[in-house]
């Protein structure tokens, strides 16, 4: 959201006995256990719950709104899961119902926003194996973007459409689910988004599968892309070097930064508790 929403403010006095076993929890129960947050340590694959916590921070902390830029919604990575992609037929609308549940989790109780009319862009975080990438729906510009740290030759996130759902590549399956949801809520951009194409972002800092442990930094790239990407409204520059060693140093720095941002965010009910304890370290 681009404006401060009082519904996401938390009372530090409400902190419960889950701390320090839980390091992040918002007022609607989205949480990150300490053991999961440790996946931000150097050399570890980032846990899905950590990427989800970052989505909640971006959604709820007004300091991450960009003046003059689109209103963005960041979905938890469980908004689209494996069974939704492998289900050949869906006569009962199970895929759309599951996606709606993911939106409810992402909106942290703000169900009045489920029609998505308050947003210009919707970010769907995908996790396939250990590979994170983003499928971004730009409702304002009526287009879609695939943002993936792996280059098009090394990525499993292919762009292949087909009349048969099961033959589509994952980004096009996500598009089908999203468009069906727009139709369900009578969104005015449903028809335009159905006709839109998916554009793969060309990233100078992209990585390849040829490097050792190609997915270790995948979550970090996704979190940085979530933070910085606003479509074609401005040049997409994340500050990443094109050189592997320098890029690794930058990812290590971002691991520390994101750990601090998540724990000290105003949407974290334990934020003030953590600040007080840090004063005595």
Tell me the role of every PLM-derived stretch.
Residues 1-281:
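Enzymes acting in ubiquitin/UBL processing and closely related pathways
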